[in-house]
Amino acid sequence: MLYFTIKNMKFRNLMKIINALREEEVVAYPTESMFGLGCDPDSISAVNKLIYLKKRKINKGFIIVAANISQLNNYIDCTSLSKNNLNKIFCTWPGFITWLMPPKKDIPCWLIGNNSLIAVRVSNFFPIKKICNIFGKPIISTSANLSGEIPAKNIKEIKHKLGSKIIILDHPIGKYSNPSEIRNGINYKIIRKG
């Protein structure tokens, strides 16, 4: 298994994560509240590896996390929302709120699953921003665990839950104890409390 610590989070070390993403692999990385698993959201090969690793159903859809709003342009249909809606959403980013928004018509079906909206977040958490900025696009963000189990909060738990076949970015998780809040971008309903 390959992993490294934040002390060594130099560009060349981050490139191990980026290269794994480009090679359609799954990576583990710290998020604001737990370790996450991520991959290229546009790669069916990578998504299939993620689904297999987590033993997760493909019809659930995924959250994608970005370094900035412009990275979401290929995924969300802003024309379907009023300026007021967009302002309410965008003023929470970067931040720890995931929004369900209308998707672009041509996005990969596995991102929304059986849902009509896509789950997106712009993070301000340093490791996520760094990965997405260097990768040049958002990544999938799902908890590092087998589907239905408690998410991993450290490297030892990742190894125990998922084995040693993924690259892990070893860095402390953020300050939150719960996953991100999820809100509906059309009616502002809270789907999952943060």
Swiss-Prot record:
Coiled coil: none
CC annotations in GO: cytoplasm
Source species of the chain: Wigglesworthia glossinidia brevipalpis
Catalysed reaction, written as an equation: L-threonine + hydrogencarbonate + ATP = L-threonylcarbamoyladenylate + diphosphate + H2O
Primary location: cytoplasm
PROSITE patterns hit by this protein: YRDC
Stated family: Belongs to the SUA5 family. TsaC subfamily.
InterPro entries, alphabetized: DHBP_synth_RibB-like_a/b_dom (IPR017945), Sua5-like_dom (IPR006070), TC-AMP_synthase (IPR023535), TC-AMP_synthase_SUA5 (IPR050156)
Gene Ontology MF terms: ATP binding; double-stranded RNA binding; L-threonylcarbamoyladenylate synthase; tRNA binding
Protein name as it appears in the record: Threonylcarbamoyl-AMP synthase
SUPFAM superfamilies reported for this sequence: YrdC/RibB
EC numbers for this chain: 2.7.7.87
The keyword Repeat belongs to this UniProt entry's keyword annotation: no
Keywords: ATP-binding, Cytoplasm, Nucleotide-binding, Nucleotidyltransferase, Transferase, tRNA processing
Function field: Required for the formation of a threonylcarbamoyl group on adenosine at position 37 (t(6)A37) in tRNAs that read codons beginning with adenine. Catalyzes the conversion of L-threonine, HCO(3)(-)/CO(2) and ATP to give threonylcarbamoyl-AMP (TC-AMP) as the acyladenylate intermediate, with the release of diphosphate.
Protein localization: Cytoplasm
Domain YrdC-like positions: 11-194
Gene encoding the protein: tsaC
Keyword Nucleotide-binding attached: yes
GO BP, one annotated term: tRNA threonylcarbamoyladenosine modification
